[in-house]
């Protein structure tokens, strides 16, 4: 598969759970191998969170020619995680947030597809990543996201953890 393949975004269903878990497992391993073992630890996102996200209708999959190759959480803000920032957002207009995005690694363009999907509903998208996730930082900056500062999340495996906060405004 290549970047020319058509990607379809759709809400995840219970039938997609095993594939989503597999993609997240592979993403954790990729991050670990690339110097970022802390962002998701060894088990995050937890299965019960994924099940809940599917039930709520905020987990999406990226389908490429009938195969799920990406997964992400998307919802409209405000997001409690983004209420306090060491820095400044580009604006305070309504936005969508993307969390827990992961790719199978078999296709390129999963992040682009998710962002394009979000931009169908808003002019502002916010996302964050770990300071050691150099791959994601490069992808976000290539798409046009601006690094706005630092936010903090609580991760059970590392406590209060800084994240690089990004904002795309169209």
PLM region spans:
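Conserved beta-strand in the GNAT
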Residues: 61, 67-77
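Glycine-rich phosphate/pyrophosphate-binding loop shared by adenosine-nucleotide-utilizing enzymes
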Residues: 7, 66-71, 96
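Conserved catalytic-core motifs of GNAT/GCN5-like acyltransferases
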Residues: 128, 146-162
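Conserved acyl-donor/pantetheine-binding loop and adjacent beta-alpha core of acyl/acetyltransferases
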Residues: 73-106, 157-158
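Conserved acetyl-CoA-binding loop-helix of GNAT-fold acetyltransferases
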Residues: 103-120, 137-142
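Conserved GNAT acetyl-CoA-binding A-motif
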Residues: 120-132
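A short beta-loop-alpha structural element at the N-terminal edge
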Residues: 8-22
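Conserved GNAT-fold acetyl-CoA-binding loop/helix
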Residues: 28-49
């Amino acid at each position: 598969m290549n970047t020319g393949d058509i990607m379809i975004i759709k809400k995840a269903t219970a039938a997609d759970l095993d594939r989503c878990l597999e993609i997240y497992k592979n993403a954790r391993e990729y991050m670990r191998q690339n110097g970022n073992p802390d962002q998701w630890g060894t088990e995050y996102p937890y299965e019960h969170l994924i099940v809940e996200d599917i039930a709520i209708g905020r987990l999406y999959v990226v389908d490429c020619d009938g195969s799920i190759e990406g997964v992400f959480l998307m919802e409209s803000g405000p997001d409690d995680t983004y209420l306090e920032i060491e820095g400044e957002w580009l604006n305070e207009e309504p936005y969508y947030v993307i969390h827990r995005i992961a790719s199978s690694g078999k296709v390129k363009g999963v992040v682009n597809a998710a962002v394009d999907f979000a931009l169908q509903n808003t002019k502002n998208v916010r996302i964050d990543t770990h300071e050691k996730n150099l791959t994601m930082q490069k992808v976000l900056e290539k798409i046009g996201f601006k690094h706005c500062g630092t936010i903090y999340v609580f991760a059970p495996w590392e406590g209060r953890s800084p994240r690089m906060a990004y904002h795309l405004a169209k």
